[in-house]
From Swiss-Prot:
Similarity annotation: Belongs to the RimP family.
Domain of life, source organism: Bacteria
Gene Ontology process terms (BP): ribosomal small subunit assembly; translation
Cellular component, GO annotation: cytosol
Protein name: Ribosome maturation factor RimP
Database matches in HAMAP family: RimP (MF_01077)
UniProt entry keywords in alphabetical sequence: Cytoplasm, Ribosome biogenesis
Cited NCBIfam families: PRK14634.1 (NF011227)
Length: 157
């Protein structure tokens, strides 16, 4: 069972605010605590939808590092990695789900008994309460609060 790092909420708040201050939005943040030193991976995107360049990532690294140092959220050595999400990543934001409607996805969720289930189908929509996918022409509604991940897939493979 995957347990999120206890500092994740504070780190996400800090990274999100720093990203907004510099014209970006936070796409994802992961803490790889098993690495020595610990690694903080931050993915940013432009709210306009424009591509994030390597120069953008490099330029964002300094203010993000400064924000981390000034916040005292982390009190151990760490490596900071800044990148942008690419195709094949997990879908997370409302924008992701709008952009990739009618694309093939894998959905991993927990059934009512707590067992992990995986469904592959075509993304139809995400509502406030459900994710709808088409599996061989049949619509499946999956409760949002049971979803562990939604990832773009290759339709042939």
């Amino acid at each position: 069972m995957f347990l999120p790092h206890p500092l994740l909420p504070d780190l996400k708040d800090l990274a999100s605010a720093t990203a907004v201050d510099h014209g970006f939005e936070l796409a994802d943040l992961q803490v790889l605590a098993h690495m020595q030193p610990m690694t903080v991976q931050i993915q940013i995107r432009r709210s306009s939808g424009d591509d994030v360049t390597l120069d953008d990532c490099a330029a964002f690294s300094a203010p993000m590092g400064e924000a981390l140092e000034n916040s005292a959220v982390l009190n151990e050595a760490y490596v900071l990695e800044i990148s942008s999400p690419g195709i094949g990543d997990h879908l997370q934001s409302d924008r992701d789900f709008q952009t990739f409607r009618r694309y093939p996805v894998d959905v991993i969720h927990r059934d009512p008994d707590g067992a992990e289930q995986k469904h592959s189908g075509t993304l139809l929509e995400r509502t406030e309460n459900h994710l709808k996918i088409s599996i061989h022409g049949r619509i499946k509604q999956i409760p949002r609060d049971s979803i562990l991940s939604v990832e773009l897939t290759n339709p042939t493979g």
